Amino acid sequence: MKIKIFIIICFFSIFSYSQKTNLSPSKPVTESYFGTKVIDEYRNLESLEDPNTINWIKSQTAYTNTILDQIPKRNYYVEKRLELDKRQGYSVSDLKITGNDKYFYLKKNENEKVAKLYYKDGLSGKEELLYDPVNYKNNKRNHDFVINYISPSWDGSKIAISMSEKGNELADVIIMDVKTKYIQPEILTNTAPASFDGIKWLNDNTGFFCVAFSTIDSKSKDFYKNTRTVLYKIGTDPKKLIEIFSAKNNPELKITEDQFPMLLDFDQEDQYYIGMVVDYSYYRKTFIISKKDLLEGKKNWKPLSDPNDKAKNLEIWNNDIVFVSGYNSSFNKLCKTSINNFNFKNPEVLVPEKKGEIIKSYRITKDGIYYTTTKNGVEAKLYVYKDGKDSPIELPYPSGNINLENKGVNYSDFWITCSGWANEGQRFKYDVKINALKPENLTPITEYPEFKNITVNEISIKARDGEEIPVSLIYSKNLRKDGKNMVLIDSYGSYGISYTPFFAKMYLLWISQGGMVAVAHVRGGGEKGEKWRLGGYKETKPNTWRDLIDCTEYLIKEKYTSKDKVAIWGASAGGITVGRAMTERPDLFKAVIAEVGVMNPLRDETTPNGQPKEFGTIKDPKEFKALLEMDSYHHIKKGVKYPATFISGGINDQRVTVWEPVKFAAKLMANNASNNPTLLKIDFEGGHGGNIPPAQRYANLGDMFAFAFWQLGHPDYQPKENTKK
């Protein structure tokens, strides 16, 4: 035993020494903001064209892989995920059903690398393979395309197929004739329908609307600027798109360069199009135009709703507009107003607010309006509004999340998918005649005996200011509150996004290996509505990471765990949450994982996807202070003992520029007074986590999984005695 301990100590010592000898060069830049001097020690790492920068990133990634290779069960997660996929047999995703009952979907068999596009004429029709992305550009080397979005025409005669690779959001869109499988020679290349507003077909199926980017250089600062909604007619030159909703086409609408003009979903029978100017505000400005006018080339968009109306999820229903209203409401109301004489502040209230339940989403059918509510973002319910009455619909089992699906306002067809932290998503069709939900799964229901002993406990803990923070606890029924449990705390807290329950196999595998998972629903998210979002927004952003700190202290106090058994995990904007929790309370956590994280928000405005409306702008003195306060990079201090940290990024990340995690890692390595590892791993074949083959995603997650178990002391993840140094 003494020999084993000695070898592990030697391993850590050599590890620490090796990393300290490969620090990044520092070329500081000093700037002054409203009288405050800010020193950016690693501004040089923002130059991704510099070979020295790329070589240092590659050397650190190689070093990280060397360290991870010492962990005996590094590959456990990816191997187990592939085993679970094999057990399931196949998976179905991105299902689209046309009004004439044609089914289009992506299907991946367990032995395949990526999903293919399939078609059926009706639920019980014969399955037909339409397209395999492996065949796209297969005459060229080093391509790895995945289908990330599909959109059939109204009659199902044609389908648009969006494909991307290596984490890029920009896609190639091709159009196929479903009957003949003929693919049009024209390819759209400056759009990203999986991320930006999808594809919306013309009534006559001769073309579609989509969002077009002004440049295909995703690293350009102007990449997300001056986007426009365009009309593409099949068979025409993709370079000659027809602008129908944009700053240039509609200057009178005063659309700014950093806003995204998009079309809302519509039905064939609708007489109008609704356009929305999308930014990162909770409520947005909308406009309306008749279909006839727009297709005749007219530009007479009329103002519809204003952000002050607090109207969301607008949908045309005959001569009315149905919407979710937050006006004078903390929990939302379901309302409608006349399309010819609209009044969003004084509408007809169909469903008044339900105390404690937030109205989230709805679908309109010819039989009524189905809608969902959530409590604390984790307890979902389903209702139907019909003939002026509001009635609950019994769910097959308690669910944390419900997704709604319908054919349109003139059809009865309505489906839901229920899921939870420990329940795999199942699909049900509502039978109007008997008022009941019947199973209609397209993916096999699989048995997971290794997850049968897992339970979920939804609790609230009191933050330092008295606010009640929802926390989802997921653990084995055999858990003991002895302070020894290895806890993984996941957290986000931005953009008003709710961390809704889903069947997270990563969580369940963590638990099956002896750990416990906590999801902290911190302020800045949408679990408790707009107020919750504004509680972790710009100047109030410190609540976001302090809620995480308070949740961690609660779990320690209640003997679920202890400081040396806690790992925190945050992805994307969740990087702010875990980064600032770590820099404010470095003593509280054993390990920190920042996955493609926002680590240097003070510099966000210089990137293609800067978010001044969510986090703040350096042009405003108050917001500058807020940005500096939430900046984890600028809160790293010399001589502080920081926890073990795993920092990941994607070289093709269009959401969070890769130099944010890179700079954070470089500064942490240079200033950390502890011998805890700081690992940087950049995926040179990926981006923000999506648009890559599943096995690649599993491998990336598996490395973070193994790192956390290693640091929390799991015996199966400790370096072996015969490890090569």
Segment roles from a protein language model:
Residues 135-150, 163-167, 182-189, 430-436, ...:
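Cap/lid segment of the alpha/beta-hydrolase catalytic domain
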Residues 519-725:
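Active-site-proximal cap/loop segments of hydrolase catalytic domains
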Residues 108, 326, 419, 490-494, ...:
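Glycine-rich His-Gly loop
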Residues 7-11, 16-403, 407-413, 419-425, ...:
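Beta-propeller folds
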Residues 270-271, 283-286, 311, 318-319, ...:
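Active-site lining segments that contact anionic ligands and/or coordinate catalytic metals
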Residues 366, 386-387, 391-393, 409-415, ...:
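Extracellular/periplasmic ectodomains of large secreted or surface enzymes and adhesion receptors
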Residues 1-5:
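Positively charged n-region of N-terminal signal peptides that target proteins for export
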Residues 139-142, 246, 253-256, 452-453, ...:
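Surface-exposed acidic, glycine/proline-enriched linker/cap segments
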